[in-house]
Amino acid sequence: MKKISACFILSIFLMFITSCTGSGFKKYFEKTVEISIQEDKNLIYATGTIISNDGLIITNKHVVENKNNILINYYDSPDIKYEANIINVSSNYDLALIKIDKKTSFFNKIDEEFSLGQKIYSIGNAKGYGLFLGEGIITSEYKNVIYNKEEILSIQTNIEIYDGCSGGPVFNKKGNLLGLMAFRLRDDGKYILGMS
């Protein structure tokens, strides 16, 4: 009987912890969008980070540059698509600004300070299967990496990144934006997971 009671209490405790954690992170999912782009016969997936309440979204340049038919949807309404327009593409960084006509919540604080070993979180649209939460640490501070024949100043993390995660927010435990997931490279059998 004691075993059953202990298991029941443990189950209730785990459900409570899960619900608290889930509701705590839900607000960050509301500030992140899924991106899909039809290119010829291929469908490209990516992620976007909302940075203003009037529909401005930041993502990676390599995702949207020279692309048409950029569609946006939210995790809680996957059947509703918004067409995005490219506002600006950075010539120096792997960043692009796009816009949709929708009022929404957004990441309103950016934190430029971080440290080696710091716990961080990310949200990504892995392979177009919808948004998911990743957790990890900063494993290397500023590092120049060659990606697509360009030298990119990046931060290395051990968060898993899949196709479709580019442009997703990386944030700290306070919910302040630190950067975007940008690329994954294989180097000497190990992955370098970059954040711009």
Enumerate the predicted regions with their spans.
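Composition-driven detection of intrinsically disordered, low-complexity segments
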Residues: 7-8, 191
